Each structure stands twice: as structure tokens, then as C-alpha cells.
Design a protein with these regions (language model features):
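Short loop/turn motifs that connect adjacent beta-strands in outer-membrane beta-barrel proteins
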Residues: 36-45, 85-93, 133-139, 180-185, ...
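Membrane-embedded beta-strands of outer-membrane beta-barrel proteins
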Residues: 50, 76-80, 124-128, 142, ...
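Residues that define the transmembrane beta-barrel architecture of outer-membrane proteins
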Residues: 42-46, 70-76, 118-124, 138, ...
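Transmembrane beta-barrel strands of outer-membrane/channel proteins
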Residues: 50-56, 97-103, 142-150, 177, ...
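Predominantly the C-terminal beta-signal and adjacent terminal strand-loop region
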Residues: 43, 168-229
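Flexible, solvent-exposed loop segments that connect beta-strands
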Residues: 58-68, 103-120, 150-167, 199-214
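Short glycine/proline- and aromatic-enriched beta-strand/turn motifs that initiate or cap beta-hairpins
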Residues: 24-83, 225-229
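Gram-negative (and chloroplast) outer-membrane scaffold detector with strong preference
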Residues: 78-155, 226
Length: 229
């Protein structure tokens, strides 16, 4: 009932305001329907490039196993980027995806059952890339998206067992800038990945208490891209 009264009062006030405005215009409201402002729309762009990453990797464990990060340098990606105009008006949007070869892992204070390892994986990153072009040679970028992957190898001498989760997926985001010298572009980005899939099945160490394990990575990236447009 109170909400209904509020709605009625609001509609009444809006009606009074409209009436006052209309009366101030001599009973007629003239609306200019012309739109003379020119909107400059940038053409679509297609980029193909390679990216190298230096990554600071680790795993978040619960309960805490005092895991320490492992830094990796064998990380490479092949990427396709498509920049487009949203509704033919805003030229700030793009989509990027590709294939990545990467390594990540951890060491721990306890090293229970020789769990310390560095994993090798193949991934498919997919992000929405927001961009802002400044002049002819500079572009700022913001990445928001995710990734999926599969762990193909491990440094653990025992290899994978039934408690190791080999499929992976998670969130991916970051930002950076690009230096443009058409048709080539140099991209510099800092990205963060957080896996939403466990590294291990929760019962890997015990059926009495579960172990949760989430890999995460902070990467520093440089890429060389070719602009086809």
C-alpha cells in the first residue's frame, strides 16, 4: 500500500511538471529532431600475433600448506584479436582468443607425498578487450574474460594419478598498452589468472579432511601483432 501511494504521488508530480513546462511554451512543445553531429567511427581491425609471458605462479591451498611461488618463462601464445564498433557508434570494443602453451606450479614447506611440481598445460584464453586509442601510435587496453585448459605434463616423478585434475578453467583479466607502427603493434600487458577448477581432487591426501587447491598466476607479457587492416 505504501509503495502504491508513492507511485501515485510520483506520477502526480511528473504530470504537474509536464503541464508547467507545456504551459510555459504556449501550449506547444517543439522538438528538434535533426541530428547534425558527425560521429567518427573507426574501421574494424583484425590482428594476428604472438605473445611471450614471464609468469609468477602458485597455488592457493585450504588448509594452508605454506606454498611458495614458482616463476616460469616457457610461456607462449598465438592470438587473434578483432576490434569492432558497437552499434556502429562506439569503437572501444574487441574480442581476443587463441592458443597458449604454459607452465606453472608451486613448492611447499611440507612437500607432502612429493606434491611439489611444475605443470605444463595448453590453454585457450578468451577475453573481451576494451581499448582506447590515443593518437596514431598509442592504445590502452583492458582485458576481462576467462580461459580453459588441459594439463599435459608434470615434473612430479610419479606423474599424474586419479586424484590429479587435468582439466582447468578460470578467470582472466588485466591491462596494458600498445605501441602501433602500422601494420605492426607491440603489446605490453600485465595479466592475472585464477583457476576455478581444483588442481587436486579434495580427497587426494585424506578422506577425513579435504584439501582445496586453486592455481593462480601473475604474468608480464609482451606481444608482436600484425594488423591486417
Amino acid at each position: 500500500m505504501v509503495k502504491l501511494i508513492r507511485h501515485i504521488l510520483l506520477l502526480t508530480l511528473l504530470g504537474l511538471l509536464f503541464s508547467a513546462t507545456a504551459s510555459g511554451q504556449g501550449g506547444f512543445v517543439e522538438i528538434d529532431t535533426t541530428f547534425s553531429k558527425k560521429v567518427q567511427v573507426r574501421p574494424t581491425e583484425h590482428l594476428l600475433g604472438v605473445r611471450y609471458s614471464y609468469e609468477m605462479t602458485g597455488v592457493h591451498f585450504a588448509p594452508d600448506l605454506k606454498a611458495e611461488r614458482v616463476n616460469t618463462y616457457k610461456n607462449f601464445a598465438l592470438l587473434y584479436t578483432y576490434y569492432h564498433n558497437l552499434w556502429d557508434v562506439w569503437s572501444y570494443f574487441g574480442i581476443q582468443f587463441g592458443a597458449k602453451y604454459c607452465q606453472y606450479g608451486f613448492t611447499s614447506y611440507y612437500n607432502i607425498d612429493n606434491m611439489d611440481q611444475t605443470l605444463t598445460a595448453v590453454e585457450i584464453p578468451l577475453v573481451t578487450q576494451l581499448k582506447l586509442d590515443v593518437g596514431r601510435h598509442l592504445r590502452f587496453m583492458l582485458d576481462i574474460g576467462g580461459f580453459g585448459g588441459y594439463r599435459i605434463d608434470t615434473t612430479n616423478p610419479k606423474g599424474f594419478d586419479e586424484f590429479d585434475q587435468r582439466w582447468d578453467y578460470g578467470a582472466l583479466g588485466g591491462g596494458g598498452f600498445a605501441l602501433k607502427f602500422h601494420p605492426f603493434e607491440l603489446h605490453f600487458e600485465v595479466l592475472y589468472q585464477y583457476s576455478l577448477a581444483f588442481l587436486y581432487h579434495p580427497e587426494k591426501l585424506s578422506t577425513e579432511w579435504w584439501l582445496y587447491s586453486y592455481p593462480n598466476r601473475l604474468s608480464f607479457n609482451v606481444g608482436l601483432h600484425f594488423n591486417f587492416d
